[in-house]
Regions:
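P-loop (Walker A) phosphate-binding loop of NTP-binding proteins
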Residues: 31
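Short beta-strand->loop micro-motif that forms the acidic, two-metal-ion catalytic signature
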Residues: 44-47
Length: 96
């Protein structure tokens, strides 16, 4: 799996995610975004959604995992999150 494959998938499904889950913004961060992925790496996704809902996060996560066949970690970007994690995300993120 290459970074470009993930970005293409997200771009192709972004409108669906916006409509179905209230997605405002989505991006790739972590090892795939940095080009440092290994065979055992998971896909790290950051999202901003209109009305935060656990089921929406799970829906986005499952949609990506089912097609790409790789474990996905999904993080909702918010003002009150751990600032160290937020800084790491903002350093690496590639918004689609």
């Amino acid at each position: 799996m290459e970074r470009e494959d993930i970005i293409k998938f997200i771009a192709a499904h972004k409108a669906k995610f916006e409509q179905e889950f209230g997605l405002k913004r989505i991006g790739l961060f972590g090892s795939y975004a940095r080009g440092e992925m290994r065979e055992e790496s998971d896909i790290d996704i950051v999202v901003e959604i209109e009305k935060p809902d656990l089921f929406h996060l799970i829906g986005i996560k499952q949609a990506i995992e089912e097609v790409l066949g790789t474990k996905v970690d999904i993080v909702r970007l918010r003002d009150t999150m751990n600032q160290t994690l937020r800084s790491r995300i903002e350093r690496d993120v590639i918004y689609v």
